[in-house]
Amino acid sequence: MRIPKWTPATWSVVAGCIGGVLGIVIVGIASPIRIISPTDNGVVTRFGKYHRTLEPGLHYLIPFVEWVYKVPVTKVQKEEFGFRTSKSSEQSHYVNNISHESLMLTGDLNIVDVEWVVQYRIVDPRAWVFNVESQERRQTIRDISKAVVNSLIGDRAILDIMGPERSAIQMRAKDMMNVLLKRIGLGVLVSSVQLQNVVPPQEVQQAFEDVNIAIQDMNRLINEGKESYNREIPKARGDADKLIQEAMGYANERVNRAKGDVARFDSIYAEYVKAPHVTKTRLYLEGLGAILEKTENVLLIDKKLENLLTLKDISKVSKKVVAGTREE
């Protein structure tokens, strides 16, 4: 058998084939090695079907059979509504003219401009990859957030939204979004909903500020009235209690005095029943004695005497006579 003689061209073809085979082998050995960063998880598919989830680290995949999708599970992501912030070099630009997202109707039929931020994190990498199309995940979160916030704003008055109900709306929106996102199986958890800015539209902002000033004045007057009430009412109550106590004391005194008079009358009457003449004489003498004690001069005159000039009046008459003589 004759062995053919290889030419240099033949040798170059053989060398190229060997190099190609070696290249395929090297690529097949090196390409299945994947590094999962500390902030990610890897979702591995085998023939397009979910197979396993990889933790951070170095992992080997079967070439041309297994593929990995890296999912940022530790990164807190956010969606902005009613405004956008974009970073250009070292500065952040703020755009807040997205009225189709921020203008809402309140429960008392007012229009309010609401800007808010939703922060969320991926907690189920498998659900995140398979349950919703990649181009629809972000829009799904935005649609749910807008529906929830619109519902909560529409149930409340504008002053409540801007004041005491603001924190309650944030907490309620977070809870409602988590319920809906869990129901559709998106694999994310909302960590916070923050109402950044809640104001009336610019066209009516001046009128609304006037209303706020009037409300503040009303509250101030109410507080002043309450302060005056708290100051005057206790004083009036004290004066009233004092008058009541004085009246009760006077009433008790009169009642006790009346009871004493009744007891005295009863005792006198009992004596009178026993000896009417003696009792009558005694009462007469006691009454006469009480009267005479208050009189300086006492004159006893017999009622049968006529043209009687008492010695007491002689001194007065003599003084008048002497005075008349001197005048003459």
From Swiss-Prot:
It is a single-pass membrane protein. HflC and HflK may interact to form a multimeric complex. CDD domains: SPFH_HflK (cd03404). It holds the Pfam family Band_7. It is found in: Membrane. This is Protein HflK. The gene is hflK. The chain crosses the membrane at residues 13-33. The keyword Phosphoprotein does not apply. Belongs to the band 7/mec-2 family. HflK subfamily. InterPro entries: Band7/mec-2_domain, Band_7, Band_7/SPFH_dom_sf, HflK. Keywords: Membrane, Transmembrane, Transmembrane helix. Its main location: membrane. It comes from the Bacteria. One of its GO terms (cellular component) is membrane. HflC and HflK could encode or regulate a protease.
